[in-house]
Amino acid sequence: IHVSHQDTSDLPFSYLIEQQSTSYIMPGANLKSVGTIRDAKKWPQRDRRADPDKLDSINYNLLSPYTIHKMLKGVSVLKELQRVSGETSDTYSYQSGKIKSSSLVNGLKYYGYAIDKFFGNSLITRLMNADCRTLEELREAFVPKSAYGDGDWVDIAGMIAPKKAVSDLLDAVERGDVSDVDSLNRCFEDIHSEYYSYEWRWACKAMEEYYGFSLAEASVDDLSELVQRWRNSVVSLDK
């Protein structure tokens, strides 16, 4: 039983441990758990729906704009705690709990691995699907083509999508443009089917902010470094 209520929504995949009437938060510790990664890989296999026309649009990706956005916020929270209290502090106060220095450092590391893995997955998929002969052609292939993807994302009963796409659909329902259940289901299916194009648009902007350079201007060395970071993250999370 926890002696105080902790809101760890800005520190996703965390453990909460009680020691001597104090709640200790271990940010991102669940990302390093083998069970978390393995369970995520098993989710699609556990889907027993036999009908090819599945009414529920479920996205099984553990790492998505929805979860990575939370991790990026978690990185900001942890770095701000370091800045305010100093990197040499033994413990950091967060809400009504405590974060040990070692847990904070590990949290930054685990979030970093997951963020690199997600961005690397998106980038490598793009590289594999790009029929390009020059760096300039590759940069052009990186330009997002989808209308949606920017901003916040939402999880709607298992469907992960840009909030704007869902809001626009709700507006269409209110206007009467979408007036029956079948049409509504088709709209949800359309949004679900465009997930990876929406994801890429979000990832491009997020990568620019996180790594400090634009893919539209990326050098071969920049891309090589991102692939290396991805490889390191995959190995580190699977240890």
Language model segments and positions:
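Glycine-rich hexapeptide-repeat left-handed beta-helix
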Residues: 1-77
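Acidic, low-complexity intrinsically disordered regions
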Residues: 20, 39, 149, 196-198, ...
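Long, charge-rich C-terminal accessory regions
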Residues: 53-187
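C-terminal amphipathic alpha-helical interaction region
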Residues: 155-239
